[in-house]
Amino acid sequence: AQNLSEEDAERLQKTIEQDEDVERYGSGIFLGAGMDERFGFSVEVRYADENMAESFNCLPTTGRLPEKENEVALSSTILESLGVTPKIGEEVTLTWEVNPMLKQYKTDTFQICGFWQGDKAVLGQMVWVSEAYAKENRYPVTQEELVNGIYNGGKEYSVWYKNLWNLEKKTENISK
């Protein structure tokens, strides 16, 4: 489930946690698109817990996911495009789109706490920020905006079921 308002996300999370068919789940927040003319590919700035990062196949192979507000984990492809050496402790400055309709952008300098080998065949390269940073800086998206295609600030979940039997029905039940 993705592009959820805070209220819908809270309801869904309670449902997921109570569902006996769910083995585990991951959660995240989509902050916005990474904005830099040196990117020759799509970049998404997000918060993700370990399960969510795993669902994107973007877990750091060196270092870890961000814990502190000024930390970031990202693909080596992004770092290379910015001319930054993939190394724990290096600083990287990133700009992302807070709200595409209002053309609002935010630029911050982060300390690299993790990275992985990027794959240029993948359409979107991920930047993981801490939960604290995401909550502090996310756009307060409304349900109406989500319906109209503004996903910045929307919450999302990935769900692993204990088995794949009747997968569509299980997902339908959680989504109600």
Each model region followed by its residue ranges:
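Basic-flanked hydrophobic alpha-helices used for secretion and membrane insertion
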Residues: A1-K176
